[in-house]
Amino acid sequence: MFNEINQDYYTVEEIASLPFYTEGPAADAEGNIFFTNLSGGSILKMGSGNKITEWASCDYPNGQIILQNGDHLVCDVKLKAVRRFDHKGRFIKNEIEKYCSGKEFTSPNDLVTDKEGNLYFTDSVRDKGKICYLSASGEQSIFLEGLDYPNGIIFSHDERWLYVAESYKNRILKIEMERRNVAAVSVFAELPSHPSGKKENNLPDGLAIDEDGNIWVAHYGSQAIHKLSPQGLLLLSIDVKMPLTSNLCFVNSHTIIVTGGYGEPGPGGVYKIYLK
């Protein structure tokens, strides 16, 4: 949808076509790729030869991360919970459910942990969206609220900054951290606008960070992912061929997995981008 920048820098390949819209991409140490299918109620695993199997059952899984011990944390929108599965896909427990520090959350969407194992996750609602915090020892707090549909969330490598997509503002926020609290909030980047001008075509979704500290954004409705410099400058836009681009993750420094689809609840797809 956008004029692509540096088209000789990458290739785009569809590696899966599926009945349901996909989300929550994550890669393990062996190179296996995991993703969720929301309405399909499954966490899926793609192994060698791009073979896809159901790895775990989950009511309405969205964002997903893999921890160092191999456990998966998954946002379940229907249950209003962040759920933990072991490395074999066996459900362990709900880490947090329905309430955070006494306040209800209704749409857990995406999540990230810091190096100490503290969890931050977005509650994606219009105008009153928030970021919830759950410490490794079980303490809860509302980290930030009053956001217009907070979505993808990622730390800088030194964890001085927390980035969050504010979907209905079509922008990425940059939060300065101070002892796990908010020191300051600023606009990191305003994203390109879809030619239609419709809000639903201008929704930044999942985020990822590369080894150089560049922030990558899945731009839902715009059929694109964008690469932003550590200063928030647009460096690259890629047409993913899939209008509802939901999320992305790095398998290695040259390979990106992108989830999303052509409608909700489906059909969905998974794409692989090779950076040259």
Predicted regions and their residues:
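Blade/loop signatures of beta-propeller domains
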Residues: 1-10, 30-31, 40, 123
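A short beta-strand motif characteristic of beta-propeller blades
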Residues: 11-16, 50-56, 92-102, 139-145, ...
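Beta-rich, blade/repeat-based domains predominating
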Residues: 16-30, 57-76, 80-81, 100-119, ...
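Beta-propeller domains
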Residues: 34-53
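Short loop/turn segments immediately following the C-termini of beta-strands
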Residues: 38, 77, 118, 124-126, ...
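A short loop-to-beta-strand structural motif that recurs across blades of beta-propeller domains
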Residues: 42-44, 81-83, 129-132, 171-173, ...
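Short, conserved beta-strand edge motifs with alternating hydrophobic and charged residues
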Residues: 122, 154, 163-166, 172-175, ...
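Short loop/turn segments immediately following beta-strands, especially the blade-tip
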Residues: 175-181, 273-276
